[in-house]
């Protein structure tokens, strides 16, 4: 635990919840409360809700905005809630339909002790000690990789230096959730990292088991969703053959139509048969569930026994691929990637660094330069549905693509732009998040972003009966829905840049992980072949519509000169030239415009503002003021110098105004700059000194 104590407190707070814990990890403190509804929900899914609530007081901060109160969850909070939900969800019994809520509240925040990992530990423990029928415990850890060594739960400094940012969770027996970004690491290193993480998980689970043995409650007896056995036997006998035939239709829409026709026929028959039965609603619910189970069983049987996939592909075969660049005019870059019936359009936008997103959460405020947003409209699957703000799934898929592509982006010094990619899923039959990564690569290269290497992504699946298993390459929607695993792998030819794994069973073995990673590598290379055949490398120039950029370096103490009082000077420059200007704390000035002449003019203005007089240099100056003791001349911009009366000429000057007048141009040489920055100049230093007159010899009589 990197020297941070892990302390668990039970029984002091939130005692009316089914289970509650306070987990103190370092100085991070998380309260987790788990509650369960008394009755089974009416829906056809398990209604589990996991929240991760960031309270700004935990970091000693005021919330932003007018209301000064926490609002909707941040992106990080949403991703953390998903991170906890995913390993917990498979640990409930099939048919369990009671609503369960797991609420994690961050009460104190320590950036060197992961609050999300404390929340995951607390979520598992709160469920385990409660009467909620949870088949845990589970635990999760973060894994870093520095100088060939794996580090469990690295602190902030270590994570910044790490080549790997991996979160892995699981039960005592197996891993059941993975989320990772990596700097092109090999499959062997990633597999070893997962196994190292699982060893640490087993220790944390042993700790939980000790606590559960002392304070755990007896699990409640709850009703599980079970169908009527006689009804099931009747439907299977009559209609299984027809449904099997429908499932084997290869094209998605045709298959959906065929299976739906069989289901509607069955529902109509049984609705008519039991129309007068007072339990009609329950019967029809069972009919729908039986049909779902029949389709589920047939898809899995085809794959495991006949080695036939619903669309006729081989186990390790990728759907037909197509890659297009420059799909859109005017934008800064675009790429259209199609894999079978999954299609994503990615659009690139470049902007000045002033457009970076400011992230103000529990961690210290920072700026985010690269954004990857993922949109999944309902028309992509031929359905109507909700439109509005991005949901948890869209946020999660966007973050996965962001991790995958971020690893190959040029540094800020190499490419001083803010970068935004938007993935529009136009058609979906599984693996749309991986299509968005491929489309993003196309858009970046088409837009002239000098990425280190193209990135491709692939989704792997699994069908397992507990003894035998089959790993699938490039899963489609039906295989994802009825399968046991969704394992997404993205990377370059050099190595992996992102992983994400979710499973519906208790866990998977190292052997399955190794096989899935090997198949994914082969598939990734095939996809990269198609991408590189379309565009082999990033274009050497940006799109004509993209903002041009130039940079100059100024001294840090000159930043205030360029900005001016209240931003007056920089605003005046922007108004005059029409450019955008960003200045960082180190004096790097970035100038953005589509007009190169405007950039050049801005550089001249700024260079003049920060220019400093130097002793020994000669300037063509203008007299701006005359005093009895000398004349003030303007060297450049706002820099004036004093030419003392004694420095005007080698001969004695009685009256300055007899020699100089305001507005006159003169050449001067800087001879002195004092500690206060006051400049003394000389005119006579540029004039040859006249020879001294010869002394007349005295004559003596």
Swiss-Prot record:
The gene is pnp. Residues 547-606 form the KH domain. Keywords: Cytoplasm, Magnesium, Metal-binding, Nucleotidyltransferase, RNA-binding, Transferase. PROSITE patterns: KH_TYPE_1, S1. Its EC number is 2.7.7.8. It comes from the Bacteria. Residues 691-701 have a biased composition (Basic and acidic residues). GO terms for biological process: mRNA catabolic process; RNA processing. Residues 682-701 are annotated as: Disordered. Mg(2+) binds at residues 480, 486. This is Polyribonucleotide nucleotidyltransferase.
């Amino acid at each position: 635990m990197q020297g941070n104590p892990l302390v668990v407190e039970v029984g002091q707070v939130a005692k009316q919840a089914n289970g509650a814990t306070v987990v103190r990890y370092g100085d991070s403190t998380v309260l987790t409360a788990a509650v369960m509804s008394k009755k089974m929900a009416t829906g056809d899914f398990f209604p589990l809700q996991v929240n991760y609530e960031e309270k700004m007081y935990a970091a000693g901060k005021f919330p932003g905005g007018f209301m000064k109160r926490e609002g909707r969850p941040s992106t990080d909070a949403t991703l953390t809630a998903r991170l906890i939900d995913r390993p917990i969800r498979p640990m409930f019994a099939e048919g369990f339909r009671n609503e369960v809520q797991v609420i994690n509240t961050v009460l104190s925040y320590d950036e060197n002790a992961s609050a999300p990992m404390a929340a995951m530990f607390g979520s598992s423990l709160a469920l385990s000690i409660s009467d909620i029928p949870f088949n845990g415990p589970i635990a999760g850890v973060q894994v870093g990789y520095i100088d060939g060594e794996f580090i469990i739960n690295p602190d902030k400094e270590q994570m910044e230096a790490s080549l790997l940012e991996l979160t892995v969770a699981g039960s005592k027996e197996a891993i059941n959730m993975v989320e990772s970004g990596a700097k092109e690491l090999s499959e062997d290193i990633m597999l070893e990292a997962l196994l190292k993480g699982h060893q640490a998980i087993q220790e944390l689970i042993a700790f939980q088991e000790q606590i559960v043995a002392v304070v755990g409650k007896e699990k409640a007896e709850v009703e599980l969703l079970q169908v009527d056995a006689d009804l099931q036997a009747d439907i299977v006998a009559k209609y299984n053959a027809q449904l099997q035939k429908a499932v084997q239709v290869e094209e998605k829409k045709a298959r959906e139509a065929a299976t739906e026709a069989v289901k509607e026929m069955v529902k109509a028959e049984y609705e008519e048969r039991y129309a007068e039965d007072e339990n009609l609603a329950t019967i029809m619910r069972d009919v729908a569930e039986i049909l779902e189970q029949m389709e589920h069983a047939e898809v899995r049987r085809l794959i495991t026994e006949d080695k036939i996939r619903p669309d006729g592909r081989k186990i390790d075969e990728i759907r037909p691929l197509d890659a297009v660049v420059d799909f859109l005019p005017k934008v800064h870059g675009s790429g259209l990637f199609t894999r079978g019936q999954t299609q994503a359009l990615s659009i690139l936008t470049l902007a000045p660094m002033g457009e970076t997103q400011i992230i103000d959460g529990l961690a210290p405020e920072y700026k985010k330069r690269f954004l990857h947003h993922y949109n999944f409209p309902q028309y992509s699957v031929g359905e109507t549905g909700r439109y509005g703000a991005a949901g948890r799934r869209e946020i999660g898929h966007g973050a996965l693509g962001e991790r995958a592509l971020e690893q190959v982006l040029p540094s800020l010094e190499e490419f001083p732009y803010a970068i935004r990619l938007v993935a529009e899923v136009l058609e979906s039959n599984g693996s749309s998040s991986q299509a968005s990564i491929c489309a993003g690569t196309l858009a970046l290269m088409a837009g002239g972003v000098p990425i280190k290497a193209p990135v491709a992504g692939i989704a792997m699946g699994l069908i397992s009966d507990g003894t035998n298993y089959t790993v699938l390459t490039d899963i489609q929607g039906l295989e994802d829905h009825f399968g046991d695993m969704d394992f997404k792998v993205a990377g370059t030819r050099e190595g992996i840049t992102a992983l994400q794994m979710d499973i519906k069973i208790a866990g998977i073995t190292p052997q399955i992980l190794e096989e899935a990673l090997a198949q994914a590598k082969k598939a990734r290379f095939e996809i990269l072949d198609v991408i590189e055949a379309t565009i082999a490398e990033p274009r050497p120039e940006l799109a004509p519509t993209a903002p041009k950029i130039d940079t100059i370096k100024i001294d840090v103490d000159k930043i205030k000169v360029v900005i001016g009082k209240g931003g007056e000077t920089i605003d005046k420059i922007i108004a005059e030239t029409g450019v955008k200007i960003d200045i960082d704390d180190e004096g790097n000035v970035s100038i953005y415009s589509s007009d190169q002449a405007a950039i050049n003019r801005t550089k001249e203005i700024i260079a003049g503002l920060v220019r400093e007089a130097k002793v020994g240099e000669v300037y063509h100056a203008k007299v701006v003021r005359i005093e009895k003791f000398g004349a003030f001349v303007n060297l450049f911009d706002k820099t004036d110098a004093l030419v003392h009366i004694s420095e005007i000429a080698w001969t004695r000057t009685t009256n300055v105004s007899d020699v100089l007048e305001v507005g006159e141009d003169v050449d001067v040489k800087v001879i002195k700059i004092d500690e206060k920055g006051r400049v003394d100049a000389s005119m006579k230093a540029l004039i040859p000194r006249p020879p001294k007159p010869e002394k007349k010899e005295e004559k003596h009589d």
